[in-house]
Amino acid sequence: MKILVLALRCDRLPLRALFIAACGMGLTFIASKTLAASPVGLWYAEGGAAEVQVFPCADEFCGRVVGLRSPLGEDGCELRDDKNPDSALRNRAIIGLLVLTGLKPIDDDQAAWSGGSIYDPASGHTYSCIARLEGNDRLFLRGYFGIQLLGRTTTWTRVGATQCQSVNR
């Protein structure tokens, strides 16, 4: 009689293990959905000429210039937003300038955003913007007027230990 009871308990063991494994896979799936690709972080823009901090703002993503390779102009003064079409804003420092706003996730794509705008302080122009993350360390941004065909794509590289050695600073 005791042997039979042990046999029944041993038969249950594979079912328990299967149940635990299934729960673990389910949790992994949920975690992967919650930890979807994100543009949040520090990025080298324009080949390392600027560092932009991308952060969540409401239900969107925004980006602010937090560093420049050459923060001073020819006159030795801090670079200003002197190309801005609004003359009242031309005295703003480039460092600290909000250059990326309004990026919202595209419904089906976990690593793409649209509906945003990107400001180019070098020209004073603001463009419509879409973004796509490739892997975890490359962010492609396309700024355009009207239709995406009439635009330019730039690649930002996430700042990290390996990039610090490979980007000329």
Where on the chain are the PLM-derived regions?
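Bacterial N-terminal signal peptides that target proteins for export
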Residues: 3-22
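N-terminal signal peptide c-region/cleavage motif recognized by signal peptidases
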Residues: 31-32
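K/E-rich alpha-helical interaction surfaces of small helical-bundle regulatory domains
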Residues: 37-51, 152-161
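Central antiparallel beta-sheet cores of small beta-barrel/beta-sandwich binding domains
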Residues: 40, 48-128
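A mature extracytoplasmic/lumenal domain signature
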Residues: 47, 56-58, 65-67, 133-135, ...
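Residue-level recognition of beta-strand termini and adjacent short loop/turns
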Residues: 107, 135-137
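Edge beta-strand at a domain terminus
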Residues: 145-169
